[in-house]
Amino acid sequence: METAEAYQTVRGRMLDLASGVDAATPVPTCPGWTIKELLSHVTGVAADVLNGNIAEAGTDPWVAVQVAARADRSLDEVTGEWVETGPQVDELCVALGDGIAQLIFDTVTHEQDLRGAIGQPGGDDAAVEVALRWAAGAWAGSEVPTSGTLLIRAGSVEAVRGDGGPVVAIDLEPLDAMAVMTGRRSLSEVQALAWDGDVEPWLPAFTWGPFVPPA
């Protein structure tokens, strides 16, 4: 799946899922956020991408502005904005391809946050692999807390941290790999997975970028 198709697919699913829900529903995997605030973020990302406001992309202040700018709007107004801007972002995805894959990663991650908030599992398709390809590259370049190699295999994607032996490895379903790599699982849950090797020295690797596993 290409980035444009992935973004269009995930956006469509999120808009469908958000239709008719209680805007004030908490999002457990995004502490302090409601569904409206989650949708304000993804809608705000679309607007910022189109306006070239990406110098601070992914930072807390950047996200906070997106949410605050839509605080006085209804959920329908927020999603209505995304309905209007989404097709323009699709065109940008066609032009930039994998150069905008971080957008897919963010949107896929938040689809799962939304699904968790309303108890509607799903969304496990090729868009997740587009997201994982970007995540694997970003994760690989982050700080290595110990010697050896940490390897997560998920579908056609391999996320590798470090170099050499010993190798600590695991095979996960793509959505499970996304959850583990985006702070949606606690360190105790990560450690309890069926690792081949001792993952404990690698646990700091699961705190990276904006992602902090819950207590």
For the regions a language model picked out, list residue spans one by one.
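A short, structured beta-strand-centered segment in the mid-to-C-terminal lobe
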Residues: 67-85
